[in-house]
Amino acid sequence: MEQLKFKKLDYSVKKEDGTEEIKKSEGKLPIRATSSSAGLDLYTTRITQEVDNSGKLVLVYHTDIAVEIPEGYVGFICMKPSISKRSIIMCNGIEVIGSDYRGELMAKFKVTTDAIPTVYTTDEPFAQLVIVPCSILEPTLVEELSETERGEKGFGEATAEQNNEIKEVKE
């Protein structure tokens, strides 16, 4: 089995006197919930706050770890299904990580309530890292594209005709 390499990252914190203090990483190695889980659970070490352009509170979930994604693969930081029990939503919906990125794994969540938000804590996974193969293709401008059954049908226009018949599969 190929290895996916992770590194702990120290971080700096501004003190009240304006100086910076280097803090040792408490980052946890991501883990699979089960042997067949597609994603690796990510845990936060700390949460910082930002305000977006619309004035909404954004929570930044830091992991204090970096990953070395092998060439030919891409990483996706995806929301956990438990997001439906929280009053936050990942800002980008999904984070895309190229194999050349070596910075901290983190995700930003927009608070969706004016009340005190229900959030993830440091003892529970807040997202999952999914690694999949990725073809690096050269963009080329052409005069025509090949024909397909769907053609130019847009959002929601490519729905197959409903046939709710259940067919028995014989082995």
Label every PLM stretch briefly.
Residues 1-171:
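Non-catalytic terminal segments and appended small domains
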